[in-house]
Amino acid sequence: MSWSPSLPTQTCGAWEMKERLGTGGFGNVIRWHNQETGEQIAIKQCRQELSPRNRERWCLEIQIMRRLNHPNVVAARDVPEGMQSLAPNDLPLLAMEYCQGGDLRKYLNQFENCCGLREGAILTLLSDIASALRYLHENRIIHRDLKPENIVLQQGEQRLIHKIIDLGYAKELDQGSLCTSFVGTLQYLAPELLEQQKYTVTVDYWSFGTLAFECITGFRPFLPNWQPVQWHSKVRQKSEMDIVVSEDLNGAVKFSSSLPHPNNLNSVLAQRLEKWLQLMLMWHPRQRGTDPVYGPNGCFKALDDILNLKLLHVLNMVTGTLHTYPVTEDESLQSLKARIRQDTGILEEDQELLQEAGLALIPDKPAAQCLSDGKLNEGRTLDMDLVFLFDNSRVTYESQVSPQPQPESVSCILQEPKRNLPFFQLRKVWGQVWHSIQALKEDCSRLQQGQRAAMMNLLRNNSCLSKMKNSMASMSQQLKAKLDFFKTSIQIDLEKYREQTEFGITSDKLLLAWREMEQAVELCGRENEVKHLVERMMALQTDIVDLQRSPMGRKQGGTLDDLEEQARELYRRLREKPRDQRTDGDSQEMVRLLLQAIQGFEKKVRVIYTQLSKTVVCKQKALELLPKVEEVVSLMSEDEKMVVRLQEKRQKELWNLLKIACSKVRGPVSGSPDSMNASRLSHPCQLMSQPCTAPDSLPEAAEKSEDLVAEAHTLCTQLENALQDTMKEQDQSLRSLDWSWLQSEEEEQQSLERAS
């Protein structure tokens, strides 16, 4: 639909006339704006010179529009009151919803769509137009004039919505379902309409297939620059499976059943849509649209199967090859890995599948765990669902990536850059060169995404390693504090034991146990292992920081962006040349840009893979350190338990010793303070074995008894004082040690209790 400048201001109540939106088969379409409500509508009015037959068609279009109700067919609106009086004739006006996105032709003519729409945009277009055509056919209506100018775009809440307009040539099916009259646009017409043969709904299949092909490739499938008579005689020679009839740069006509390159489809969609186009572009109408599975008119169901595919894109970082896999909702990740092994030769156990953020796919979840709804992002590239494949059996990566093969016409001008070409060929091949440079930039960007995914995964592993290092260091300090306390306690015990052995308690068994404890704790601590691991982790940390500081560790633009912009500008200037200046020309400047882009791509890929190899080496070191740190942490945990057990054992032995000493104090005693000692207390039988001498007299015996009682009281007091001094000394010794580690453990325990 062509756009024109604003028309002279004209009003009808609150409605104000704006610009002409386009010119249809019967008249003009003008936008009107309601100044009070902000509502906009499109008013279609007929030209005065319509023939009776076309006046009849016009009234039929209004009747059809008013009874249709489908989201992909433009809706009729009520003509505002009083506006009919402004019509240039007595024919009724047609009011329709206004779609601010313009028509599909305007969209296709944008520079970036010179080699076809983006994959997501193609899928949403096919879905919308198929839904609209199916609705029309179910209502026994053939459109007969489906083309980009008759499809308008409306921005919905989540994506663009495509709507069919201009049913001026639509035909309701009669009882025989055959029609013989037509006046329409020739380039999208089915052959039987050109031949003025009887036709059915399959004429819309041909138009839809032609439209779909143009949206995929950027040009119409069958000799788009030929006149109708020559076109018909040549194209009818194609086989039923041929979907392309084109001229090469030498003027030779070629037939092909394959979807041409370049386009923006992945390999799976390209293959499936190629077969679907073969159904839609069959020359003979009775066979057209017949699907091998769904039968006659089964093309819509076949298209549904394609549109409902869930596709996972896997970039093999070893070779740079992009693989696409249809996956089901319940397909396991292991099943996907088996398919990947068939395509890449990488064993399942060596495959690592990372998302862009560096997260690995979860083994217990289905293969489709990372897929999103691509239909909601019709303007974006397919990288949003990209998964990066790494081979864990490799310790280094070498660049095995080469630029994609060039289209035939681009290869031709690479060999002959000075060759003059007609303007229409020059325009097409320059667009393909620009697309090739774009493809190099996107391929490079995907590889860089893969390298960054590996880097993000390394940082995740390093973060885990850092947490374990901190935990290991903290545990090492706590263990050291416990060991120091235990060793100090043992040393004090042994020292005090030696001080009192001559006149005090002697126990070889107790002494041996303490010696064994002292030797046992000498093997605890793991200080050397911890120190060695910390040194290795610090060295790894330095390597990772160096990687992050590297220019390739961050997203960059650079040469390819500049070359792509220069190619775009050359192509833009060529397309915008006035018609009288569209002469033959060569492609030297474009070829120079393409060759520079190829060189820049190869150089950048080498840098990416150098960075990737360093990343993989660091990751390997991190993965080697993780189990070693876990092992040391586990050993320190066992050491800590051992120290606690030994400490408990020592404490029990000390208290048992005190218990024995106290029990002896309460037994029979004799002698004087000078002769009484712990050795005697430990052998009470010695007290009983001393000979008794009879007192000389009763008063003397009574006096001696009083002396013994006094002496016993004195000894008890001395023993109590000695025990108190010993306990006080031990308490001071305990207080002098660092007990902060126990406080931290107690706080952790309290926090856990509050959390539970």
UniProtKB/Swiss-Prot annotation:
Entry-annotated residues carrying Phosphoserine: 177, 181, 670, 672, 675, 682, 689, 697, 705, 733, 740
Quaternary state and interactors: Component of the I-kappa-B-kinase (IKK) core complex consisting of CHUK, IKBKB and IKBKG; probably four alpha/CHUK-beta/IKBKB dimers are associated with four gamma/IKBKG subunits. The IKK core complex seems to associate with regulatory or adapter proteins to form a IKK-signalosome holo-complex. The IKK complex associates with TERF2IP/RAP1, leading to promote IKK-mediated phosphorylation of RELA/p65. Part of a complex composed of NCOA2, NCOA3, CHUK/IKKA, IKBKB, IKBKG and CREBBP. Part of a 70-90 kDa complex at least consisting of CHUK/IKKA, IKBKB, NFKBIA, RELA, ELP1 and MAP3K14.
Active site: 145 (proton acceptor)
InterPro entries, per database record: IKBKB_SDD (IPR041185), IKBKB_SDD_sf (IPR046375), IKK (IPR051180), IKKbetaNEMObind (IPR022007), Kinase-like_dom_sf (IPR011009), Prot_kinase_dom (IPR000719), Ser/Thr_kinase_AS (IPR008271), Ubiquitin-like_domsf (IPR029071)
Post-translational modification: Upon cytokine stimulation, phosphorylated on Ser-177 and Ser-181 by MEKK1 and/or MAP3K14/NIK as well as TBK1 and PRKCZ; which enhances activity. Phosphorylated by MAP3K7/TAK1 in response to NOD1 and NOD2 signaling, promoting activation and phosphorylation of NF-kappa-B inhibitors, leading to NF-kappa-B activation. Once activated, autophosphorylates on the C-terminal serine cluster; which decreases activity and prevents prolonged activation of the inflammatory response.
SUPFAM superfamilies, alphabetized: Protein kinase-like (PK-like), Ubiquitin-like
Species this protein is from: Bos taurus
Keyword vocabulary terms for this entry: ATP-binding, Cytoplasm, Hydroxylation, Isopeptide bond, Kinase, Membrane, Nucleotide-binding, Nucleus, Phosphoprotein, S-nitrosylation, Serine/threonine-protein kinase, Transferase, Ubl conjugation
Protein name: Inhibitor of nuclear factor kappa-B kinase subunit beta
Region (NEMO-binding): 737-742
Functional note: Serine kinase that plays an essential role in the NF-kappa-B signaling pathway which is activated by multiple stimuli such as inflammatory cytokines, bacterial or viral products, DNA damages or other cellular stresses. Acts as a part of the canonical IKK complex in the conventional pathway of NF-kappa-B activation. Phosphorylates inhibitors of NF-kappa-B on 2 critical serine residues. These modifications allow polyubiquitination of the inhibitors and subsequent degradation by the proteasome.
Family annotation (CDD domains): STKc_IKK_beta (cd14038), Ubl_IKKA_like (cd17046)
Covalent cross-link Glycyl lysine isopeptide (Lys-Gly) (interchain with G-Cter in ubiquitin), where: 163
Compartments, record wording: Cytoplasm; Nucleus; Membrane raft
Modified residues (S-nitrosocysteine): 179
GO MF: ATP binding; IkappaB kinase activity; protein heterodimerization activity; protein homodimerization activity; protein kinase activity; protein serine kinase activity; protein serine/threonine kinase activity
Origin organism lineage: Eukaryota, Metazoa, Chordata, Craniata, Vertebrata
Catalytic activity line of the entry: L-seryl-[I-kappa-B protein] + ATP = O-phospho-L-seryl-[I-kappa-B protein] + ADP + H(+); L-seryl-[protein] + ATP = O-phospho-L-seryl-[protein] + ADP + H(+); L-threonyl-[protein] + ATP = O-phospho-L-threonyl-[protein] + ADP + H(+)
Chain ranges passing through the membrane: none
GO biological process: cellular response to tumor necrosis factor; positive regulation of canonical NF-kappaB signal transduction; positive regulation of transcription by RNA polymerase II; tumor necrosis factor-mediated signaling pathway
Residues recorded with modification Hydroxyproline: 191
Domain Protein kinase positions: 15-300
Entry note about domains: The kinase domain is located in the N-terminal region. The leucine zipper is important to allow homo- and hetero-dimerization. At the C-terminal region is located the region responsible for the interaction with NEMO/IKBKG.
Family note: Belongs to the protein kinase superfamily. Ser/Thr protein kinase family. I-kappa-B kinase subfamily.
SMART domains found in the cross-reference section: IKKbetaNEMObind (SM01239), S_TKc (SM00220)
Region feature (Leucine-zipper): 458-479
Residues that, per the record, bind ATP: 21-29, 44
GO cellular component: cytoplasm; IkappaB kinase complex; membrane raft; nucleus
